Structures are given as structure tokens and as C-alpha cells.
UniProtKB/Swiss-Prot annotation:
Disulfide bonds: none annotated. One of its GO terms (biological process) is DNA replication. Required for the timely initiation of chromosomal replication via direct interactions with the DnaA initiator protein. The lineage of its organism: Bacteria, Pseudomonadati, Pseudomonadota, Gammaproteobacteria, Enterobacterales. InterPro entries: DiaA (IPR023070), GmhA/DiaA (IPR035461), SIS_dom (IPR001347), SIS_dom_sf (IPR046348), SIS_GmhA/DiaA_subfam (IPR050099). The keyword NADP does not apply. Residues 34-196 form the SIS domain. Pfam families: SIS_2. Belongs to the SIS family. DiaA subfamily. NCBIfam families: PRK10886.1. Keywords: DNA replication. This is DnaA initiator-associating protein DiaA. It comes from Yersinia pseudotuberculosis serotype O:1b (strain IP 31758). One of its GO terms (molecular function) is carbohydrate derivative binding. Homotetramer; dimer of dimers.
Length: 196
């Protein structure tokens, strides 16, 4: 059992090292897209399922409240956080539309959709991205594995941050780290001299 535990840590560390080599440019581009949207008076919509939903909510909470330093609130909405809306849509057997309907209702040109999907194939996330395209929104996609269907939907101005792993747990761990990096970059770009 102890060797298995050590193996989990080792695999996580190795994935982090690979991501540190592969992802800085994509993370930087994503952060700049998010910053530019906020500077233009737009907002960030976030969505995901399961652990990805938790990461989406963590991002939105860090924007609205704060990440590590006190600063003004920033507009972000986790589309998976409103249970009444979610259950109303799924009650009508529109599971695949659970986020797309919200994107069509709330999304505006210049907004960003932060779409988080471990494999990139979740139908409701794919539909949300398709809806964001029709609203002229920028998409930042956090994926893993081969990027899935999401990777094929992205345009030139969109950004995919694909975790270099085919293990769901490692992808999800690195998604959380990536979300924290994005929050840090946004704060340090918009509020460079803020202290705790």
C-alpha cells in the first residue's frame, strides 16, 4: 500500500513537470484572453461536470471574492452552481443543453467561456462551447487526454490548455493547478501592487 501511495505522488509530480514544460504559453494566452475580456467590461462564464464543476466554481469564487489578495470583485459565473436552473433544464430531458441554454441567455460578445472537461467529450460542455461560438465569445478550454471533441471546436482566438496525461485523476489535479495559475495571473496583471 505504501508503494502505491508513493506511486500516486510520483506520477502526479511527473505530470506536473511535463505540464510545466508544455503549458506556460497556453496558460499565458488564456490569462491574457481573460484579462482582456474583464478590461473590456465583459464577464467569464464557467462550466464543468463533477470535479470539473468544482474547479469551475473555485474559479468563479476566486474572481468574485478574491484569490490570494484583497481586490475589487471581478464578474464570473459558474453555470453549474444554480441547482434550480440545472434541475429545471434536466427535468425537461435536456441534459445536453444544461449549459448551452445558460450560455445563450447570459453570454455576450466579448465574454469568455471557461469550459473544463477531463476528456473533452462531455456532451453538455461541447454544446456550451457551440453556443458560445454563436454568441461570439472567446473559449478557454481545459482538457486532457487528446482534447476530445472540444479541441476540434476551437477557433484561432480560443485557447486550449491540454494537460499532458491520459489519467483522469492527474488531469483533474492539473486543472486545479491551472485554475490557480489563471487566478494568480489575472490578479497580478490587473492589480500588480496589491498586497494581502
Amino acid at each position: 500500500m505504501l508503494e502505491r501511495i508513493k506511486g500516486c505522488f510520483t506520477e502526479s509530480i511527473q505530470t506536473q513537470i511535463a505540464a510545466a514544460e508544455a503549458l506556460p504559453d497556453a496558460i499565458s494566452c488564456a490569462a491574457m484572453a481573460l484579462v482582456q475580456s474583464l478590461l473590456n467590461g465583459n464577464k467569464i462564464l464557467c462550466c464543468g461536470n463533477g470535479t470539473s464543476a468544482a474547479n469551475a466554481q473555485h474559479f468563479a469564487a476566486s474572481m468574485i471574492n478574491r484569490f490570494e489578495t484583497e481586490r475589487p470583485s471581478l464578474p464570473a459565473i459558474a453555470l453549474n452552481a444554480d441547482n434550480v436552473v440545472l434541475t429545471a433544464i434536466t427535468n425537461d430531458r435536456l441534459h445536453d443543453e444544461v449549459y448551452a441554454k445558460q450560455v445563450r441567455a447570459l453570454g455576450q460578445a466579448g465574454d469568455v467561456l471557461l469550459a473544463i472537461s477531463t476528456r473533452g467529450n462531455s456532451r453538455d460542455i461541447v454544446k456550451a462551447v457551440e453556443a458560445a461560438v454563436t454568441r461570439d465569445m472567446t473559449i478557454v478550454a481545459l482538457t486532457g487526454y487528446d482534447g476530445g471533441e472540444l479541441a476540434g471546436l476551437l477557433g484561432q482566438l480560443d485557447v486550449e490548455i491540454r494537460i499532458p496525461s491520459h489519467r483522469g485523476a492527474r488531469v483533474q489535479e492539473l486543472h486545479m493547478l491551472t485554475v490557480n495559475c489563471l487566478c494568480d495571473l489575472i490578479d497580478n496583471t490587473l492589480f500588480p501592487h496589491q498586497d494581502d
